[in-house]
Amino acid sequence: MFFRQIFDVRAAEPLNIFSSGGRKYKSVLKILSIIAMAAMLGIQIYVLLTHKVVLASDSQRYFELATNAVKNGVWYPSSLNIHDTYIFGNGLINLLILSIRLTGSIEAIKFVNIFCIYAILISCIYIIRKIFGDTEIQYWFTVIFCSTGTFWGEVAQARTELIFMAFAFGATALLMTGKIYTCLISGIFFALANWTRPLGVVFLIAGIWLLVTQRAKLKQYLCLVLGAAVTVCVIGGIAYFNCGYFAYQATTGGYNLLMGASEGADGTSKFEVFGEGGAGYLSEKQKSEMTFKEKDAFYKSEAMKWIKENPGDYIKLMPKKMLVTLYSEGYSLGTFYNDATAGNGGAFYRGLIGRMTGQSEEKLSSADIIVIWTQAVYMVTLVLAFVCVVFLIVKRRAAKLMPFIFTVAGAIGVTMLLVGGPRYHFPILPYIIMAAAILIQSVATIKEHKNEA
C-alpha cells in the first residue's frame, strides 16, 4: 500500500494541505514575488548593458565553431566537422551562427538568455498551479528563483543550459494543459531541447510518466511521440545532407565517459587521459583520419574496458561525481568578474575564503558578495529540497510529483555514470527550487493550522 501511494496518484494522499488560506499572508508573498522579479530584471538589464558575453571552455569552442561556419557559409554540423573530436551544442551553435549573420556578433544571445529565463519561470509557475492550484507555493518559488544569482549571471554566458531548459520546461508545462495539440508541440520542444543538450530524453521520459499520472488519452501519447520523432528526423536529415551523418544531437558521451572511467579519474573533468600515454590518446594522424563517430566509439570502448577491469573503482567514484555536481552554484557568476572561469573550482573558493576571513590582502569585491549570496541561497535551497522529497514520500503525497523527482534523479544519475561538474545540475535547478518552495509552504501551513487549533 505504501509504494502504491507513492506511485499511484489515485491511491496517494491529497495535496490540498499546502494552501494556508490566509489572505494577508498570500498578499505579502505576492508582493515579495513581484519585488523579487523586478530586482532580478533590473540586475539582468544592468548585465545586458554593461557586460559583454564571457567565453571559456565550452562556450569558447561554441563561438569558434559558429564563427568558422559563418566564414564558410554553412550551418552546424557540416563537412567541416566530420573529423572533430565530437559534435556538441548543436542547437546553440546554430543560434550563434544566426546571430553572427544577422548582427555581426554573438551579443544578441544575451536577449535570448533573458527570454529563456522568464520562459522557464513562467513554465514552472504554470506547473505548480496545475499540481497545487492557486497556493502560495508559486510565490515562494518565484522569490527563491529570482534570488538565485545564477539567473543573473547566466545572461552574459553563451551556453546550452538556458535554451535547453526553456524548451524542456516549456514542453513539460504544455503536457499539463490536457490538450492534444499541445502534446504535439511538447514533443517538438523536447526534441529541440535534446538537440541543444543531450539530456532531453530524461525530461521526455518524465513527460510520458506525467501523462500516465494524468490518465491521458492515447492520442496525447501519439502526438507527443510524433512531434518528437518528426523533429528529430528533420534536424537529423538536414545534418545528414550537410555532413553525411545523421548528427541530430551531441556525441560527447564517449568523451565524458572516459574522463570518468579511466586511470587517474577523480570524478571531475580531467583531460590527462587524452594526453600521450593516456587511454584516450590519439595521434594527430589518427585525429585527422577518424570521424567524430569513430572517436566516440573509441572513447566508449576504452572506458568500458576500464570499467570491466575496475568495477569497484568506477562505483566508488559515483558519490564523488554527485558531490562535485551539487556542491557549487558559482558556474554562472564569472560574468561579474568578466572572466568565465571565475566563480568556480577549489582554487577560487580557497581564495574567496581567504578574502572573507581576512587572511588575504585582497578585499571582498561586489562579485565576491554575489557569489557568497548565491552559494548561501543555493545550499539552503538544496537542503530544503532534500527534506521535501523525504517529507512527501513519508507522508504518501509524492505520486503527482514523481515524474519531477525522477527527472532530478535521472539528471544526477547521468553525471554519476559519466563525469561530474557543477554546471550539470543547472538543468534541474528549477525543480530543486520548486521542492524547497513546497517544503516552506508546508511548514507555514502546518504552523497556521496549529495556531488555529
PLM regions: where:
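Multi-pass, polyprenyl lipid-linked donor-dependent membrane glycosyltransferases
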Residues: S57, I87, I109-C116, W140-G170, ...
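Extracytosolic helix-loop segments that constitute the early lumenal/periplasmic catalytic or substrate-binding loops
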Residues: Q60-D84, G91-L92, G264-Y281
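Loop-to-helix entry region of an early transmembrane alpha helix in multi-pass inner-membrane enzymes
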Residues: Y86, N90-L98, L102-I122, E154, ...
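Membrane-interface alpha helices of multi-pass inner-membrane proteins
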Residues: I97, T142, C146, L174, ...
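Transmembrane-helix signature of polytopic, membrane-embedded enzymes
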Residues: A108, L121-G149, M165-A166, Y181, ...
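Membrane-interface anchor segments at the N-terminal boundary of transmembrane helices
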Residues: A108, L317-F404
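Membrane-interface transmembrane helices that cradle and orient dolichyl/undecaprenyl
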Residues: K130-F132, F169-I185, L211-R215, I440-V443
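Membrane-proximal stem/loop segments at transmembrane-domain junctions that anchor or position
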Residues: Y248-F348
